[in-house]
């Protein structure tokens, strides 16, 4: 459910997204509140070679990041973005990474021309008037500009300006490149903020555990993308352990902001407010909690559409692919692969669900 986006406004945006074809409404009985979105075939994943840290010097960008001179980057990006909003609606998204008003939280504002971005950010972050009220007259917020432009991969850039608290993304409409609160802010910009303020932004899950004696422990764990963070974060204790009183709960499945407390211990929050999970391989056995979370108010991206019941399907969901379906590129698919043509990609290289 969207947090901070009024129900009436949310319904209007969802209806507009379906009217324009940007999204498809799914079966309200089987998947209430769920939508399907397809990106262009050339825009299906984060693009690390087009992602830049535009710090004052290359040394400040870090050894594993791409660097671009800030002045050069601003000129290039504004030349690409100029006039790209003509004839389009501009949406303004004030959002909080972390609970609104928490001393651990940070605020950002994203401008975008994509309803898909608005509806996803309403799931993944806390948005709305409370954020603006909390910000007040402070200048401590992250500026974000997203321009879909023409989805031209040759002019696609995702640039972070840590010294300016600024993010600019152009020529993409894929989640990881355009939901600027995620990797762009919560990891890249936040890493610089943490360096200045003595805390850490980490690509880590947070998991709570309680034993039968009532002792509670929390763990953080770092895996690369699509390597099991969400599955571990949403772990359910085996029946034998459940019967003995062991409990596990998910605090976060992707990003941790970690601080040292006054008692010398480490404290972490999940700055996000939803889940942006990898769909393939998610099923009743591998991650029943994640699957249950997708059963309502979820935005699916680049998965197959089952035309018989207007639901979605992806690789690994079950062993019964739909025989009357549309793949992630909008092409008819009969649930089979072709040895002559190779496997028909019914889901894209990085299909997602946002719940």
Task: Explain the meaning of each model-derived region.
Residues 217-239:
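Glycine-rich phosphate-binding P-loop
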């Amino acid at each position: 459910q969207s947090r901070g986006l009024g129900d009436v406004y949310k319904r209007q945006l969802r209806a507009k997204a379906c009217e324009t074809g940007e999204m498809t409404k799914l079966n309200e009985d089987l998947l209430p509140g769920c939508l399907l979105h397809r990106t262009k075939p050339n825009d299906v994943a984060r693009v690390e070679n087009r992602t830049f840290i535009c710090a004052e010097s290359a040394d400040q960008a870090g050894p594993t990041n791409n660097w671009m001179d800030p002045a050069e980057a601003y000129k290039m990006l504004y030349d690409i973005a100029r006039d790209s909003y003509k004839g389009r609606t501009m949406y303004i998204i004030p959002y909080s990474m972390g609970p609104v008003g928490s001393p651990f939280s940070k605020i950002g504002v994203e401008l975008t021309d994509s309803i898909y971005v608005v509806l996803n950010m309403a799931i993944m972050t806390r948005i709305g008037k409370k954020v603006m009220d909390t910000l007040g007259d402070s200048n401590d917020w992250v500026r974000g500009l997203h321009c879909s432009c023409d989805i031209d991969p040759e002019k696609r850039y995702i640039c972070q300006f840590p010294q300016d608290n600024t993010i600019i993304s152009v020529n993409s409409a894929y989640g990881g490149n355009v939901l600027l609160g995620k990797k762009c802010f919560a990891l890249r910009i936040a890493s610089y903020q943490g360096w200045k303020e003595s805390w850490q932004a980490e690509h880590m899950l947070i998991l709570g555990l309680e034993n039968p004696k009532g002792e509670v422990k929390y763990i953080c764990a770092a895996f690369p993308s699509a390597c099991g963070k969400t599955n571990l974060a949403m772990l359910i204790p085996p029946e034998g352990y459940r019967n003995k009183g062991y409990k596990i709960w998910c605090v976060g499945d992707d990003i941790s902001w970690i601080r040292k407390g006054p008692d010398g211990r480490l404290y972490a929050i999940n700055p996000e407010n939803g889940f942006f999970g990898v769909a393939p391989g998610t099923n009743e056995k591998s991650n029943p909690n994640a699957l249950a979370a997708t059963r309502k108010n979820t935005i699916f991206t680049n998965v197959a559409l089952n035309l018989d019941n207007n639901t979605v399907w992806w690789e690994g969901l079950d062993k019964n692919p739909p025989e009357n379906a549309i793949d992630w590129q909008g092409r008819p698919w009969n649930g089979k692969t072709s040895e002559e043509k190779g496997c028909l990609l019914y889901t894209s290289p990085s299909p997602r669900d946002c719940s």
